[in-house]
């Protein structure tokens, strides 16, 4: 059953995965495709980036600020004492090889590292370099993408069987009626994952009860994926590479709606070694730009995260929430008392604030809104919360 299409294209997938905002996106790919170099330039860290299949054994984790012109504008406007942007948590995971689900390479350890992440930067290599060996002997990014997909799929298939066997023993043969709905849902998952051999996230009509069960098991193929294509510096600058069209065709066919972002690890490394002035000159001379801001934003969005702002002379801050969060729960991100004693959210749209020039001007234009507890916070809202302070119990 293909994903349903809405009026604006592909129907967005349901949110499957851990609930919360401290979510991680893992960099996944075959060995020697440029994962550690990408992680280094993304986080300005120095994880080992040797030409060796398993140079990253323990996943390196870092967090990177999410670039946002709105945040920058609010900081310039308020000139606050404290500036706190939103952050994306990124994990560099060692290279997967064919047969990983059976323990090949460092197999199951790597798959468990992926399981601990909430989304995937699927990095594939589309550059030739005789000095950097390819574990499969040749450069073919479409083949490499298929290998990773197959390993994740096979691991999920391997997981489903024991879960159903255990539930069948208790819910069917043991007569535990409470677990029967979970058993039925897992049978549906089995039909989709094993019989039809499709990733969990490709089914766009999981209901709330089914998602609750899926979230207990965190299947690898339920994780959202952003495809990153590592090009040579030359190909990235000239925006040409023989593999790009083939990769896009594959993704459109097998992972519709997923983003494909070309970048060049070599270019990003070069830019990092230049001074700010030299970097600007180099980018202008080659009529190009870094792909990192776009990649960071795409990873953040893939995790179904967004943020609202609190802004003033003391602090400008981006508060990370899940998409669909209501005002009281958003207030609770600041302090639990804000949620418990929630009265209302006073909301300005960033665009209105920038256009009108001040909070008072937004109010005068009738664009300052008072929202109740059913208001769903939108990305980029500037919010001031009103709340009652909980009464302290009287001492006896």
Curated annotation (Swiss-Prot):
Gene Ontology annotations for the cellular component aspect, listed alphabetically: cytoplasm; nucleolus
Keyword Ribonucleoprotein: no
InterPro entries, per database record: ATPase_YchF/OLA1, Beta-grasp_dom_sf, G_OBG, GTP-bd, P-loop_NTPase, TGS, TGS-like, TGS-like_dom_sf
Domain OBG-type G per the UniProt entry, residue ranges: 23-283
Gene Ontology MF annotations: ATP binding; ATP hydrolysis activity; GTP binding; metal ion binding; ribosomal large subunit binding
Positions where N6-acetyllysine occurs in the chain: 294
Binding of Mg(2+), residues: 36, 56
Top-level lineage group: Eukaryota
HAMAP family linked: YchF_OLA1_ATPase
Protein name (Swiss-Prot/TrEMBL): Obg-like ATPase 1
